Design a protein with these regions (language model features):
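Catalytic loop of short-chain dehydrogenase/reductase
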Residues: 123-146
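Substrate-binding pocket helix/loop in short-chain dehydrogenase/reductase
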Residues: 83-84, 91-94
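A short, exposed helix-loop element centered on a Lys and neighboring polar residues
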Residues: 107-108
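N-terminal Rossmann NAD(P)H-binding glycine-rich loop of SDR-like oxidoreductase domains
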Residues: 10, 18
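Conserved NAD(P)H cofactor-binding loop of Rossmann-fold oxidoreductase domains
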Residues: 76-80
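Rossmann-fold cofactor-recognition segment
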Residues: 43-56
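Conserved Rossmann-fold cofactor-binding substructure of NAD(P)-dependent oxidoreductases
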Residues: 54-67
Length: 146
């Protein structure tokens, strides 16, 4: 059975992605900053895991808890609809820490496991939109080797 770890499953795309893969028979590790029972259908193939992608300690604890995975979906993210000139610097820093640095940190965290295990993650997906492009250097041969 394939195992998929999805960050940012409390709502939106992450929540719907977790639902989809549960319906397809996958083992789903749904991560959230504050896991909430009941947001996803109960299943013996579902694990809710606490994860804040802006915290190195939280990432390390989550990776240690979940073990081997087949797919990582870097979905955790925050949005902002404010005009740049009216947006506090702290809000921009939080957006960058979550959407960019969090994606990089999660990818870095799963690469060692994929190098040790023959069946390590075969696919690592960044969250993408026309306004939130993932730097092309995240698609390295090490990450895309399968």
């Amino acid at each position: 059975m394939q195992t998929i770890m999805i960050t940012g499953c409390s709502s939106g795309f992450g929540l719907e992605t977790a639902r989809y893969f549960l319906e397809q028979g996958w083992k789903v590790i749904a991560t959230m900053r504050a896991p909430q029972e009941g947001v996803l259908p109960a299943s013996d193939r579902l694990r809710l895991v606490r994860l804040d992608v802006t915290s190195a300690q939280s990432i390390a604890e989550a990776i240690a808890e979940v073990g081997e995975i087949d797919v990582l979906v870097n979905n955790a993210g925050v949005g902002m609809l404010n005009a740049l000139e009216g947006t506090p610097r702290e809000a921009i820093a939080n957006l960058f820490a979550t959407n960019t640095l969090g994606t990089i940190a999660m990818t870095q965290a799963v690469i060692p496991g994929s190098e040790r295990a023959e069946a390590g993650p075969s696919l690592i997906l960044p969250r993408r939109s026309p306004c939130n492009r993932c730097p092309c250097w995240l698609s390295t041969p090490r990450v895309r080797r399968r």
